[in-house]
Amino acid sequence: MTIEEQDAQALDAYSHAVTGAAETVGPAVVRIDIDREGGRFSRSLFGGGLGSGFIFASDGQILTNAHVVSNARRIRVTLADGRVFDAGLVGAEPDADVAVLRIGADHLPVAELGRAPLKVGQLVIAVGNPYGLNWTVTAGVVSALGRELPGGPGRREMKNLIQTDTSINPGNSGGPLVDSLGRVVGITTAMMPMAQGLGFSIPLETVKAAIARINRRRESRPSPRRSPSGTARTLSGRDTARRRGSPHSGRPRSSHRRR
């Protein structure tokens, strides 16, 4: 076998890993649109008003970033099959930048959470909605582990982050970072402004600990009043599902243009 043939085989293996991972996790990835008091928030470091998330329980529970849904008046979730739901906020851990949402649907496709520890140089894939370009897939490697980001205006200090060169842009926040088998290894959370190839994700152990704390608080307080669909009534509007055109076209709706 020639060197050129070996290179072609390596590229094919890489391509198959990326496409396979995207096909595995894609059905569980969601788009999140936020209305805040005073209208739609259009600009923030993290692309507030538009974000990503993923279904981690088939009864409609969704993981995303706390900053994506902070101060939300209304949260709308678009599934990969085009259905749109109003969502309730189950709980949030701002220090970890993790939030759990729930929609009134069940028997949904679920993203598998990984178990193996990450290694520097490992292939990772991000799926999300940068700038409203729905279900965008980007690939890269784990550049470093245990990174810290200093706090600043409107954001908290963050520790123990995964650094990747996977392309991350406003709107990616809250989406899954997955391994070559499509298993979630982190939640995309931030990019370095004015830089390329510097993205950061929350590691899975931090996410799992945040979910456990949210569940403990949820179990220790009285149950919220629920709508007939099962979504907690923490939002204005009805918990409805509307069938729209497929989001896979990648074309952002003009009313959702933000950064």
Q: Where are these predicted regions, by residue range?
A:
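Serine-dependent protease modules
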Residues: M1-L235, T240-R242, S254-R258
